[in-house]
């Protein structure tokens, strides 16, 4: 039988309001009364209902987390960072997988609101117009981590993908690359746009250009990397920038199967630097994103909104660096 707040109050011989104050950490309770109530809570193994507490205090100490693909290593590392900070600030997370489906995201978003969450955090993915509208009308604060929400007026944490793309392109040109291709994905459209801007800007400076036929869009998976190479192979690019590690590994394997030497004939760079980059030979050159920090800082930003703290910068850009390994010269 479920133990209720009424049972605790009766056993401790106090009012239900007093039990509620103890459970919610209200300091306006005598120490001896607090100790007595806590003893009864422990004795009866009472577990407060978060939603019921939320109705009284207008807070449930829960946050909703929406992830495009929880099985993706990139998003799991973001999730670890946010979960640690949520725990530090005594929040519980409700994690939901959206499959990058706007209709499913909308359903999850509304479901989280119905659960009285105190805030919502999106991990990566693309912010659709429908979701942007929901965020702007939301009764609770929302932060996105792993994508840039500045243009949409949404608080966010990310790296500067445009700057990273410029650095990579300059390096590859220095190493002899003249023909470039780009492999993107549906999960990271904003990052993809920024990478293409940086790539094209540097190519123009060197009197080169990116053939639109050498832009491949997929779902950021290993199989998409295989398909991308098949699509791009006849053009024989010198270098490929890939938005995800899984895609890039597919590119490496497809190139090797076709007898193309990586990196002598084809240089490949990815943008995630998950643990997968060291599991392929040659090891994958990649942009090192502070994935754990992106998730952690996103959650900390959300806690500031939920606790009505001062916000110095609603759109945080964290530093990145590039690790050139075996897939580049």
Swiss-Prot record:
GO molecular function: DNA-binding transcription factor activity; transcription cis-regulatory region binding
Keyword Heme: no
InterPro entries assigned: CcpA, HTH_LacI, LacI/GalR-like_sensor, Lambda_DNA-bd_dom_sf, Peripla_BP_I
Taxonomy, superkingdom: Bacteria
Record key words, sorted: Activator, DNA-binding, Repressor, Transcription, Transcription regulation
DNA-binding region per Swiss-Prot/TrEMBL record: 5-24
Limits of the HTH lacI-type domain: 1-57
PANTHER family per record: ARABINOSE METABOLISM TRANSCRIPTIONAL REPRESSOR, LACI-RELATED TRANSCRIPTIONAL REPRESSOR
Record function comment: Global transcriptional regulator of carbon catabolite repression (CCR) and carbon catabolite activation (CCA), which ensures optimal energy usage under diverse conditions.
Name this polypeptide is given: Catabolite control protein A
Originating species: Staphylococcus xylosus
């Amino acid at each position: 039988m479920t133990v209720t707040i009424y049972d605790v109050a009766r056993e401790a011989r106090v009012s239900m309001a007093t039990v509620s104050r103890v459970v919610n950490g209200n300091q306006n309770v005598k120490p001896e009364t607090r100790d007595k109530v806590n003893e009864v809570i422990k004795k009866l193994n009472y577990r407060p209902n978060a939603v019921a507490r939320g109705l009284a205090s207008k807070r449930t100490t829960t946050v909703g987390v929406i992830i495009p693909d929880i099985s993706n290593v990139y998003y799991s590392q973001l999730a670890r960072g946010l979960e640690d900070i949520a725990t530090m600030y005594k929040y519980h997370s409700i994690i939901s997988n959206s499959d990058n489906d706007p209709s499913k995201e909308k359903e999850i978003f509304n479901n989280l609101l119905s659960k009285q969450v105190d805030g919502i955090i999106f991990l990566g993915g693309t912010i659709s117009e429908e979701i942007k509208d929901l965020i702007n009308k939301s009764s609770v604060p929302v932060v996105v981590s792993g994508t840039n929400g500045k243009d949409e007026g949404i608080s966010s944490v990310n790296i500067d993908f445009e700057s990273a793309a410029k650095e990579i392109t300059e390096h590859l040109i220095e190493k002899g690359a003249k023909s470039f291709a780009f492999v993107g994905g549906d999960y990271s459209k904003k990052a993809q746009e920024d990478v293409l801007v940086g790539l094209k800007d540097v190519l123009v400076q060197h009197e080169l250009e990116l053939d639109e036929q050498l832009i491949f869009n997929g779902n950021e998976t290993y199989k998409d990397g295989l398909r991308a190479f098949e699509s791009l192979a006849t053009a024989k690019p010198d270098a490929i920038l890939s938005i995800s590690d899984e895609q890039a590994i597919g590119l490496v394997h497809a190139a090797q199967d076709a007898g193309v030497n990586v990196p002598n004939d084809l240089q490949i760079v990815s943008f995630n630097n998950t643990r997968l980059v060291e599991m392929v030979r040659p090891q994958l050159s990649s942009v090192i994103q502070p994935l754990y920090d992106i998730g952690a800082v996103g959650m900390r930003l959300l806690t500031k909104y939920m606790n009505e703290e001062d916000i110095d910068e609603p759109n945080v850009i964290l530093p990145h660096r590039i690790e050139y390994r075996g897939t580049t010269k």
